[in-house]
Amino acid sequence: NVTMGAADADEQQVRRALSVAQADFVHELPLGLDTEVGEQGLSLSGGQRQRLALARAVVGEPRFLVLDDPLSALDVHTETLVEAALRQVLERTTAVVVAHRPSTVMLADRVALLSGGRIAAVGTHQELLRDNAEYAWLMSGAGDEPAGPVEEPAG
């Protein structure tokens, strides 16, 4: 179902989309691209499902693309490969990317920092690092730490 939403995509576009998404594993499935993977792809790992979703998103070479944390379920090695290929796709399209990982945020030409449900700052990654303490704090990884100790219920 890689061509879902882009039924007119040719074989070359499908191969390119699979390559961008590092989803070449589909060729190792019993029937390749024709393999049934079950409802919602339940026979695939989370990372495999995410890579197929990314391939589906880029197969039609859209002019506008919305991606919601497109690399969150990938291991570090695959994430690095997908990022490199995704950079090429993003050069040819307008994209809105919701991201939490610093490496994904750095793919953007412009970054909008959301805080308290509002846009708190807009700029390049470097501008926000320099000029916005909250952004710098989040990019440092400090935002990944728990807010405080978890209290155990009394017994």
Regions found by a protein language model. Give the residues of each.
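C-terminal portion of ABC ATPase nucleotide-binding domains
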Residues: 11, 31-32, 79, 84, ...
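A short, proline-enriched helix->beta-strand linker immediately N-terminal to the Walker B motif
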Residues: 59-63, 92
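ABC ATPase nucleotide-binding domain helical subdomain, centered on the C-loop/LSGGQ "ABC signature"
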Residues: 1-38, 87, 92
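Short, contiguous acidic/charged loop-to-helix segments that flank catalytic cores in large enzymes
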Residues: 1-9, 41-44, 72-74, 103
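Catalytic Walker B motif of ABC-type/P-loop ATPase nucleotide-binding domains
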Residues: 65-68
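ABC-fold ATPase nucleotide-binding domain signature/coupling loops
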Residues: 24-52, 70, 74-77, 145-155
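Hydrophobic anchor residue at the start of the ABC signature
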Residues: 54, 98
